[in-house]
């Protein structure tokens, strides 16, 4: 960051990022890209003509996310927490979109975009040339030094990541002799070639026609016919696993593959270390590279695979037909309920292929999904890639509003127009009805819920609903804000939240846990853990506690006994889920610092803190134990896999420091000096523009996968600084 001497009082900012040499040849003119939004929806558009670009100048928001230079009025560098809050907010408020929300990419997994590109190629829908270029640029910016790709960005190369993205780049037009492709191919062969890809990769290669279905672990659709009360029915599984499995089983049951063409024939030669015709396909079913496999298969998993193979040999034709019809019904209803989005891009891609097989390319199903292809795509500094969902619109907006309330910014007249727009977006995002066929298609009721992303996506999430209700109650009682969301609608949301509680207390994300934990013994993904059923999460539970206590103060006569009973059980869950080290373990953020922040806030809502609660004392000791000499905290994503706190190799990180400070403040930790040092670190890391720079992956999705949540460095940091000022005052910090 630097001050431009030709423009007094102006700071010129630019992301500290540059393309790799391989990626630079694919870049488009980034000054031509514009972001269109509609009720949380994101659609990046390339303006073809100079006249169009001139008539619609690029916004600050667009320049920031693309990594282009931007201009801001210069502000004095902060020397205290309140000044840092004001500088940070002056920057972050400019990232609000025209429809009132804060959005961003939540990319990270390196198989999401490739699945969507493969599906679109098979269906025969061309991709715009500028999008193709930016997709290539992204992959060549995040490629590993050995030329391969991992399960997610910043992870070691795997067969799955490398083969999926190799196929994607070939589809997008890169030739086999391109240096990047030759290097990727060498890594792929060194790791075992495409023969050693996990089941998920084998599926995508099968539908593309570059792998044979006999080499797949069977994915029969018949579990859909099992009584819904039994754990083997997909309705008992985690919602993402369920959605992916249903469409995969449909395509497996039909042995759907793209007819061979020149590219398919070429890939059959390029992906393998032995001739395609000589491969013993049944022997490849359990051939998974050590680089991909999370754990060795158990005897139960091996026996389960053998049983599936035997069943496939002796399957009953009329049951198979019924099961395939049921799978198609489930896919159609999912697509209809989500307005052609599907719960996430991963199942969007496989659902698109199933609907293409059933109804053809000219059907309304494919036309609708073609128009939704752009929704999860985000053009970031590295290029264009699909996010894990169709965005984070509601989640990030609710957290941003909470940050402004905590920092005392919401009550300031100059901020109310911005926050009224945010409130309007939150208002428009509430889901007002249940899904069609709610019970038949295993959906959780959604009437009154708020989604993670957009209303069209239509899935209820416990913590996003809780965070939305909390900020609505807090914001609507500040003078100057309209009561847009009625008491009745808030009560519907509370009813929904109470209905999502698990037996014995605690909250999952999308729906209460439905299946027994032994289902994890049958996990054949090879890539992930704890993905067969939903789980209890301290993060979600704590958000609900904060929501219910906030709501109960404002509406003390609405279901007080039910709310109090839920709060009591939720606290019990938090206490029994605390780790022996004193922290709580997160499944959605990194990791102990993230969950411990939430848990301490939840306990604080019930009046528990370091002075009167042994759990809070242990948690404070845990956080203080891991503070770095510079005052910050830095936790590695590897913590997710190894289940123990691992310091980040690059030292302190802004997000982890913000989490720790928020947790210690919530617990009323008596070590004021440690908190002050953490706050000083956050102030020191702030740039002249008021921003905080991007860091390592902030989020987790399906352990051990990492994801980006780039807005976390803004709203959690603003929360930490604002709460520090509210509790300890605005003292000058020695930076």
From Swiss-Prot:
InterPro entries the UniProt entry points to: SQ_cyclase_C, SQ_cyclase_N, Squalene_cyclase, Terpenoid_cyclase/PrenylTrfase
Any Gene Ontology CC annotation: lipid droplet
PFTB repeats: 132-173, 490-531, 567-607, 616-663
Active site: 463 (proton donor)
Recorded GO MF terms: lanosterol synthase activity
Induction (record text): Expression is under the control of the secondary metabolism regulator laeA. Expression is down-regulated when gliT is deleted and up-regulated upon exposure to exogenous gliotoxin.
Gene Ontology biological-process annotations: (17Z)-protosta-17(20),24-dien-3beta-ol biosynthetic process; ergosterol biosynthetic process; helvolic acid biosynthetic process; secondary metabolic process
Claim: Lipid biosynthesis is one of the keywords in the record: yes
EC number: 5.4.99.32
Domain of life: Eukaryota
This protein's pathway: Mycotoxin biosynthesis
Keyword annotations: Isomerase, Lipid biosynthesis, Lipid metabolism, Repeat, Steroid biosynthesis, Virulence
Keyword Isomerase belongs to the record: yes
Catalysed transformations (reactions): (S)-2,3-epoxysqualene = (17Z)-protosta-17(20),24-dien-3beta-ol
Family: Belongs to the terpene cyclase/mutase family.
PANTHER family listed in its UniProt record: LANOSTEROL SYNTHASE, TERPENE CYCLASE/MUTASE FAMILY MEMBER
Function: Protostadienol synthase; part of the gene cluster that mediates the biosynthesis of helvolic acid, an antibacterial nortriterpenoid. Protostadienol synthase helA cyclizes (3S)-oxidosqualene to (17Z)-protosta-17(20),24-dien-3-beta-ol (protostadienol). The synthesis of protostadienol is followed by several steps of monooxygenation, dehydrogenation, and acyl transfer to yield the final helvolic acid.
Name under which the protein is recorded: Protostadienol synthase helA
Native source organism of the sequence: Aspergillus fumigatus (strain ATCC MYA-4609 / CBS 101355 / FGSC A1100 / Af293)
């Amino acid at each position: 960051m630097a001050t431009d001497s030709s423009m007094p009082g102006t700071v010129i900012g630019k992301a500290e990022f540059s393309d790799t040499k391989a990626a630079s040849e694919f870049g488009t003119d980034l000054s031509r890209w514009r972001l269109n939004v509609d009720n949380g929806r994101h659609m990046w558009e390339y303006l073809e003509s100079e006249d169009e670009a001139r008539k619609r100048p690029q916004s600050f928001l667009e320049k920031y996310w693309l990594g282009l230079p931007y201009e801001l009025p210069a502000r004095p560098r902060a020397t205290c927490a309140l000044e840092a809050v004001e500088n940070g907010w002056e920057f972050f408020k400019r990232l609000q979109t025209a429809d009132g929300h804060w959005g961003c990419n939540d990319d990270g997994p390196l198989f999401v975009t490739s699945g969507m590109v493969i599906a679109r190629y098979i269906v025969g829908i061309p991709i715009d040339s500028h999008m193709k270029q930016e997709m290539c640029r992204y992959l060549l910016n995040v490629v590993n030094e050995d030329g391969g790709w991992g399960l997610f960005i910043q992870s070691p190369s795997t067969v799955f990541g490398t083969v999926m993205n190799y196929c994607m780049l070939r589809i997008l037009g890169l030739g086999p002799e391109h240096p990047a492709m030759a290097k990727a191919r060498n890594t792929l062969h060194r790791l075992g070639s495409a023969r050693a890809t996990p089941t998920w990769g084998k599926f995508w290669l099968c539908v593309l026609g570059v792998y044979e279905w006999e080499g797949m672990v069977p994915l029969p659709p018949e579990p859909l016919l099992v009584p819904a009360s039994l754990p083997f029915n997909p309705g008992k599984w985690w919602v993402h696993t369920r959605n992916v499995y249903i469409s995969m089983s449909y395509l497996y049951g039909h042995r759907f593959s793209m007819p061979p063409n020149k590219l398919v024939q070429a890939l059959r030669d390029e992906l393998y270390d032995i001739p395609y015709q000589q491969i013993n396909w049944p022997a490849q079913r359990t051939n998974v590279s050590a680089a991909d496999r999370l754990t060795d298969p158990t005897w139960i998993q091996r026996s389960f695979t053998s049983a599936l193979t035997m069943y496939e040999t002796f399957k009953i034709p009329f049951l198979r037909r019924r099961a395939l019809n049921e799978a198609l019904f489930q896919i159609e209803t999912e697509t209809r309920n989500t307005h052609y989005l599907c719960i996430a891009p991963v199942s969007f891609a496989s659902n698109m292929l199933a609907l293409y097989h059933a109804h053809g390319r000219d059907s309304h199903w494919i036309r609708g999904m073609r128009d939704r292809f752009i929704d999860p795509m985000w053009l970031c500094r590295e290029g264009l890639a699909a996010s894990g969902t169709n965005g984070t619109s509601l989640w990030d907006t609710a957290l941003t509003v909470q940050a402004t309330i905590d920092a005392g910014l919401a009550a300031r007249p100059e901020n109310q127009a911005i926050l009224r727009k945010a409130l309007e977006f939150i208002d428009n995002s509430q889901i007002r009805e249940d899904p069609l066929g709610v019970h038949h298609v295993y959906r959780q009721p959604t009437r009154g819920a708020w989604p993670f992303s957009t209303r069209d996506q239509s899935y209820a999430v416990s913590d996003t609903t809780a965070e939305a209700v909390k900020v609505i109650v807090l914001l609507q009682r500040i003078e100057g804000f309209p009561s847009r969301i009625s008491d009745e609608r808030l009560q519907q949301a509370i009813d929904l939240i109470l209905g999502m509680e698990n037996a014995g207390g605690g909250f999952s994300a999308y729906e209460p846990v439905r299946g027994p934990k032994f289902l994890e013994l049958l996990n054949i993904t090879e890539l992930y853990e704890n993905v067969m059923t939903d789980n209890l999460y301290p993060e979600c539970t704590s958000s609900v506690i904060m929501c219910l206590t906030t709501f109960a103060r404002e509406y003390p006569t609405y279901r007080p006994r039910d709310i109090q009973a839920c709060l009591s059980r939720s606290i019990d869950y938090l206490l029994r889920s605390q780790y022996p080290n004193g922290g709580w373990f997160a499944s959605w953020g990194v990791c102990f610092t993230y969950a411990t922040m939430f848990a301490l806030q939840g306990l604080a809502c019930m009046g528990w803190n370091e002075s009167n609660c042994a759990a809070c004392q242990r948690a404070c000791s845990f956080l203080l134990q891991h503070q770095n000499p510079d005052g910050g905290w830095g936790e590695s994503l590897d913590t997710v896999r190894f289940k123990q706190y691992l310091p980040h190799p690059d030292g302190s990180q802004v997000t982890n420091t913000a989490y720790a400070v928020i947790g210690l403040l919530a617990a009323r930790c008596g070590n004021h000096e440690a908190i002050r040092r953490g706050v000083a670190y956050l102030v020191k890391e702030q740039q002249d523009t008021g921003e905080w720079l991007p860091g390592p992956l902030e989020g987790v999705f399906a352990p051990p996968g990492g994801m980006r949540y780039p807005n976390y460095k803004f709203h959690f940091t603003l929360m930490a600084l604002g709460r520090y000022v509210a509790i300890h005052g605005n003292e000058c910090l020695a930076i």
